Amino acid sequence: MVNLGLSRVDDAVAAKHPGLGEYAACQSHAFMKGVFTFVTGTGMAFGLQMFIQRKFPYPLQWSLLVAVVAGSVVSYGVTRVESEKCNNLWLFLETGQLPKDRSTDQRS
């Protein structure tokens, strides 16, 4: 058994997919970047609202709600982009080729 983060993976699976450790590390980094973005984005949004609240007073609960929602949206975006990079890395490690452009835009 091979330890992969908190879970254990069979040796046969780890041998079949040699890039599994790199992919797991990439995903872990992507999720931690998302958590950091959530904390930072929420703090920045809350600080900005405290600055704006001097001119346009409104209840604190709305400041917290808007800050958390803004932090969540930005964090989701960052995590999605970073996870897509990890997916591309996984495809490259498995096939040896860069993934094709999967956009639906048909311009040539």
UniProtKB/Swiss-Prot annotation:
The chain crosses the membrane at residues 32-52, 58-78. Gene3D superfamilies: Tmem141 protein family (1.10.3350.20). GO terms for cellular component: membrane; mitochondrion. It is found in: Membrane. Pfam families: TMEM141. Its main location: membrane. It is a multi-pass membrane protein. Keywords: Membrane, Transmembrane, Transmembrane helix. Belongs to the TMEM141 family. This is Transmembrane protein 141.
